[in-house]
Amino acid sequence: MGGRMRALQFHGGHKAQIIDTPRPEAPPGWAVVKVHYCCLCGSDLWLYRGKWHGNRYPIVPGHEWAGVVDSAPEGYESWVGRPVTGDLIVGCQGCGPCRDGLPVMCENLIEIGFTVDGGCAGYVAVPITNLYLLPEGMDLAAASQTEPLAVALHAVDRINLRPAERVAVLGAGGIGQLILQSARATGATVTLATDLVAERRKIAEESGAAAAVHPSELPELTSYADKVDVVFEASGDPESVVRALDLVRPGGRVCLVGYQVGAEHALETARLPLSYASLVGVMGPGGKYREAVDLLANGAIDTQPILTDIVTLDDYAPAIDRAINRTDGTVRVVFDLRNE
């Protein structure tokens, strides 16, 4: 191995820098991947601000990436040179949550891009069992969206979304847009999407939402027939959870996917029994990576509308600023790392 690479490093408190550093060494059972593309998501922006939890600083962020295997452990030599993406969740396999099939809740959790260095670098080290082979020739920028699409599919599965059900998606950022497409892929109808940003509302409508409005312009749905069967809350805004209960029909379901660090919820618990709705939380990809890869590879999910900013590491500062402030139509920032 040997050699050096450049990487984006976060220090918290809105502090970041580009570093020149040795390429990662692979522990036993781990592979090293040459990263081609890595995307910043909302949790990375909280990490940049210094408001995430359970991480270390300094840290190389990045858990949404795709690349090519550079080195692999014994028994996986044939994987070298093949395109892959990978799961960020490394469970201990021995604690209660891991034994119950919930590695995202592992009591000894390792998270690539949070507790160990991630994919915003020329190379990243990943357990070989966390890697997923991609079809040869697959667009690796699109493949960098495997993890967020897996989260969207996990939400759709956990809420038991059924064909012909009526859906609202509150928050049309990256995850919200992928939930919207995933819901439609199941045969559901997305009757409504919301977002603060006009460009994101436009993308939502172009992706199949019957209507997309500013949250302040949400219609007042009073009749059972007007309300939706399922609401996906993908913004993390506490007020949006309250709005979700206004939109869902009695007996419907609300899925909480969005997450804002430190947000205080304004939900009166009495609303839940009075709404006769089920409230479900979703965290992480939930084992949906292979399904996500297949949907991206066959074009059933289109990432092109949300990959708005493909930049190099040299442009990290203005790109992060656009992502945080949602300016210039930015939905997702993706770093092109092929030359790092």
From Swiss-Prot:
Coiled coil region boundaries: none
> Tell me, what is one Gene Ontology molecular-function annotation carried by this entry?
metal ion binding
Q: Do you know which InterPro entries this protein is assigned to?
A: ADH-like_C, ADH-like_N, D-isomer_DH_CS1, GroES-like_sf, NAD(P)-bd_dom_sf, Zn_alcohol_dh
Per the UniProt record, which EC number(s) apply here? 1.1.1.329
Keyword Ribonucleoprotein, does the record have it?
A: no
Task: Write out the residues that bind Zn(2+) 2.
Answer: C92, C95, C98, C106
Q: Top enzyme class of this protein?
A: oxidoreductase
Q: What reaction is this protein's catalytic activity?
A: 2-deoxy-scyllo-inosamine + NADP(+) = 3-amino-2,3-dideoxy-scyllo-inosose + NADPH + H(+); 2-deoxy-scyllo-inosamine + NAD(+) = 3-amino-2,3-dideoxy-scyllo-inosose + NADH + H(+)
For the ligand (Zn(2+) 1), the binding residues are C41, H63, E147
Q: Which pathway is this protein engaged in?
A: Metabolic intermediate biosynthesis; 2-deoxystreptamine biosynthesis; 2-deoxystreptamine from D-glucose 6-phosphate: step 3/4; Antibiotic biosynthesis; gentamicin biosynthesis
Please, which domain of life does this record's source organism belong to? Bacteria
Paste the cofactor note.
Binds 2 Zn(2+) ions per subunit.
UniProt cross-references to PANTHER family, sorted A to Z: L-THREONINE 3-DEHYDROGENASE
Q: What does this protein do?
A: Catalyzes the oxidation of 2-deoxy-scyllo-inosamine (DOIA) with NAD(+) or NADP(+), forming 3-amino-2,3-dideoxy-scyllo-inosose (amino-DOI).
The UniProt entry's sequence similarity note says: Belongs to the zinc-containing alcohol dehydrogenase family. DOIA dehydrogenase subfamily.
| The protein, known as | 2-deoxy-scyllo-inosamine dehydrogenase
Instruction: State the encoding gene.
Output: gacH
